[in-house]
């Protein structure tokens, strides 16, 4: 499963979930790309998109997307650190088309 984290998500997710294949939007050269175009890029190369952008579901049509989206409640490192076990568990069970909000 190929995973990408949005530029608003702390890189601690990648650093702490080292057994997973995770890239960042910045590593892909997509920093600053608007969500609509970004989702097209992500769909072409990844299975899961992790973001903390709560407006994503209201600004974009997520129906029939061929990726899973995991929405985090915050972009604050202490919050994300506490959620790492839950994030890892959700990644174990996530399927294409899922939209999961932690």
Where are these regions (language model features)?
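C-terminal structural segments of small proteins and small subunits
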Residues: 68-102
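Structural motif
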Residues: 2, 48, 68-69
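Acidic, metal-binding active-site segment of PIN/NYN-like and related structure-specific nucleases
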Residues: 42, 46-60
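A short alpha/beta connector and helix-capping loop motif
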Residues: 22, 60-74
């Amino acid at each position: 499963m190929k995973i990408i984290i949005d530029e608003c998500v702390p890189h601690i997710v990648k650093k702490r979930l080292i057994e997973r294949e995770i890239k960042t939007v910045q590593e892909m050269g997509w920093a600053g790309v608007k969500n609509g175009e970004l989702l097209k890029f992500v769909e072409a190369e990844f299975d899961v998109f992790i973001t903390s952008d709560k407006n994503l579901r209201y600004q974009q049509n997520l129906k029939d997307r061929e990726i899973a989206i995991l929405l985090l409640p915050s972009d604050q490192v202490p919050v994300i650190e506490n959620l790492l076990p839950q994030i890892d568990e959700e990644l174990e069970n996530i399927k294409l088309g899922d939209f999961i909000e932690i």
